[in-house]
Amino acid sequence: MDKMTRERLIAYRSNKAEILELEYVLENRWKSDTMIGNDVVFDYSKGYPMPQTVVGFDQKKYERLQERDLNRKKWLEKECEEIEEFVEGIPDSITRRIFRIYFIDGRKPVKQKDVAKKVHMDQSSISRKIDDYLKTA
């Protein structure tokens, strides 16, 4: 596990959203018109080569894109799991709650003053607890 940084923690929500987007793409890519490709084959039915265009599903492109997106999704899931384990591994209850509320819970970013209200502290204490814990972690 790499060193936990504020940037990795902040990226958590975006990573979760990207995982959902990748799941949708992985399941629906085959329906897309972008998977239709064309190729040229030579028709020898008249005794000499005549180029003919063949239109169809581009299987190689589909497999390449699916593999790329699947690998990206696996990496993002691993990253999110590491962040969740890091936050759950924080021994102090207040600090753990601050990290969970500020970095993990919900779909939209939360302001430190909102976290402060939830844990009954002032905003500067929230910022200080986050910075202090990340320095020692």
What are these regions (language model features)?
Residues K111-V119:
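Short alpha-helical "recognition helix" segments of helix-turn-helix
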Residues S127-D131:
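Key DNA-contacting residues within the recognition helix of helix-turn-helix
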Residues D92-D105:
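Short amphipathic alpha helix immediately N-terminal
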Residues L134-A137:
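C-terminal flanking helix
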